[in-house]
Structure formats: structure tokens, C-alpha cells
Amino acid sequence: QRYEMNRAAGDLILPNHFATNNLNTAVNYKGNQEGWHDQTQAVFASVETGWKNMLFLTLTGRNDWASQLAYTDNKSYFYWSAGLSAVISNMVEMPSWLTFMKMRGSYSQVASPFDRFLSNPSYKYNDQTHNWSKSDTYPAHDLKPEDTRSWELGLNVRFLESLSLDVTYYRSNTYNQTIYAPLSASSGYKNFVAQTGNIQNQGVELALGYDNKWGDFSWSSNFTYTFNQNKIKELAHGIPDPITGIPVDV
């Protein structure tokens, strides 16, 4: 992924002639140029298998090499997922009113890189003073990708010929979120990058459906209920100062 942009602003030498070569660079001139190029290389594998139309297993794995991780101790990151489902109605004899039952469970881990230039800060251009200055963020080399771990349990049931019920419970926790913590002015920097926190998201989804047909007339309806809760389980606490090693509270 590549992004480039050049921009300039200032007073006009000739009125109503809007061109960059008509800008008065001596008065109120503002010029800026920026751009970046991100690159991610990955290896992905997936396996799906089943047994006697009763048990089904899915496994996936992926390893990413992202350019944002350059100049860090972690050159790549691996994440995976696993899902298992069991068709109970094919395993044991069910009551006549219960035509189908399936239970399912899954776990997944998803990682994503942090913002570019955090491990290798670039110079900043001030379009007011037309000067370049170094970044005021202390360079960090022990950064890790943001990590989200999720698991889900579900039940699918069809009964009384026309009714269906789908119940799902899910929970996810996100770790290694990137924040900026203040540094002492004597360090020569304004802040440093820290990765911490635990944000939890969990909820329940219920879906009740009804499908029937009478001659040429058919009816299909679905009722859903959703409950979702977000909670901050852990904030930044006791992060070591990269220079002094003293814990810092944010």
C-alpha cells in the first residue's frame, strides 16, 4: 500500500490564476510533502475435515511479515483459529419433535500491526516555519502487534417441523493496545509508546425462526435478540519508563 501527497498554499502573484508556479513563496507560503509505503507478506494455511457427517473440524494459521515491524524485536507474528462442530442429531436418536441439533465452538486469534514509523520515527515538517524537526516520541524496539483473542459457543436447533432456534455466546479480549505515555522533558522527548490494556467485548445472540408452507402460500419470519457489553478490564498501570525503568501510571 502506497500513499504520496504534495501540497502548497500561499498568496497569489497574479489574481485568480490558481497554479503552484503563481504562488508567492516569500509571503505566507505553506508547502508540505508526505508519503508512505506499507507492505505485508503472509503465509496462510487452512485444514477442514469431517467424520461420518457428525463431527467437523476447521483449523487455520497465518504468519505475517509487516513493514511496520521493522526495527523491532518482532519481525513477524503468527495467529490461528480452530472450530469444532458436532451434529448431535446424527449421533444419538432424538425425540420425534426435535429434527436437528448442532453444537459448535470456536477460538480465534487475530493480530494487526501498530501505526507506521513508531519503531523508526521520521522527521516532522513544520509548514509554518518551513523547518524539519525530529520526532518528540522516544523510539521503541520492543513493540508487538495488537492481539485480539475470541471464542464462541453456539447451538442450532430445529423442532416442531417449522421452528428453528440459534443461540450464540461470544467473548473477545484485545491486548497490546498502543498508547502514548509522558516522559520527563530532560529526556529530550515528549512521550514514549507503550502497549498495554485489556478491552473485553462479550454478548449473546438469540434468533427464533418460523418457516411454513400451505399450498402456494409460504411464510417465513425471524425474531432476534442481541445483548452486547464492552468492558475495560485493564488500563495502563506500572509501565516502565524506557530510560529510567521507573514505573509510570497513565
Model-derived regions: residue spans:
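Extracellular/periplasmic, surface-exposed regions of secreted and cell-surface proteins
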Residues: 1-250
